[in-house]
Amino acid sequence: MKQNNPFAVVGYNGPEYFCDREKETAKFVAAIENDRNVTLIAPRRYGKTGLIHHVQRQLSPEYTCIYLDIFALKNLSEFARTFASAVVGSLDTPVEKTLATVAKFFKSCRPTVLPQENGMPKFSFDVVPQQAEATIAETFEYLKRRDHRAVIAIDEFQQILEFPETGTEAMLRSHVQDVPWVRFVFAGSRHHMMGEMFLSAKHPFYQSTDIMPLDVIDRAKYAEFACRHFNAAGQTFDEGAFTTLYRRFDGITWYLQSILNRIWQNGEGFTSAAQIDEVVDDLVKDRSIIFRDLYFSQNESSQQLLSAIAADGEAREVLSGSFLLRHRLAATSSVRSALKVLQKKDLVYRTENGWVVYDRIFGEWLRRLA
């Protein structure tokens, strides 16, 4: 049988292929098992989704684990449909998984059964906007009636702030606190929005969860993990080359995994930094059309600021006179406006050391554009 590539870039392939996060996992599991909800905050590509699935694997079998990603949702009715579809049927026995049983709970929408390859039914819900809150209330009532321990992880939870409907936070908070045997994980990638939701006294979820910011994995731990898997495949591994990779991409999980995945695939070991350049070249070329369209869809001020931040790698003072002069940027007011636009579009974000291009491969493309 062909050996699996140990450096997964999509999904969760089990504890054998999961790097470190031992302290975070222990803290996470302890919170759930002691009836505390968790807020997990990390930029995208740091591995928070993988951590959620890893924690779910570590929990006692008495917990049913449910996961939904709401990043692409635009309004409350889409959330109601996604939430109900994820929850309903997850806590039941096969006998209970009948349309008639589910229909008893849901009067605000029409549930339908979708056939699955494994033979188990999956429910879909046709939710009209006017009945979205009612459908959500019915889903929580369904959870209450099941009387069964569960963990529900909602990824990119800050997206609810983008919904046009008002009062969504307060409505969800009132329901969440009413199901004591269900624990919730609220994960998000926008620090400022998640911080506002859970750390500001003005918001309904204020101090209602354990806050877990997620940092990058320790370099030595990651090197040990990578070395073990290269050696297991009979391939050599140079820690110095790995350190170059780690520093180039600031230890961010997705980039390390993507590049290690391709180096391991070649079967020649990881022996030099030149291999990193080869893989990055391929990644940039593969995405060049997308990056070009993205770049030229921005206005001139945003294009110039993107290029300037990419050129610096980590731009400390983007509104300073020296930064503007060095990169030949427009007035401070124009740069400030462009920065707000780029941040809202998730094209740049702020680290402890300064502003960076969110997608590091896009940053590589921008530096080559210059």
What is each PLM-predicted segment?
Residues 2-5, 285, 289-370:
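C-terminal leucine-rich, beta-strand-based interaction scaffolds used for sensing/assembly
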